[in-house]
């Protein structure tokens, strides 16, 4: 994924929410994505863990 990509994010107890990637930070354990959501237009950070399917919170939106 890249900055400005449309994505969906997994949140606690609700449906996936649509947003836009504002920034990306890579770490050895995975990748942090700053995603602008309707409720958080300045962005909120989500972490995708490497090698753990349950740890994937940000996915690229289907075209």
From Swiss-Prot:
InterPro entries: Dextransucrase_DSRB. It comes from the Bacteria. Signal peptide: none annotated. It holds the Pfam family DSRB. Belongs to the DsrB family. NCBIfam families: PRK10708.1. This is Protein DsrB. It comes from Klebsiella pneumoniae (strain 342). The gene is dsrB.
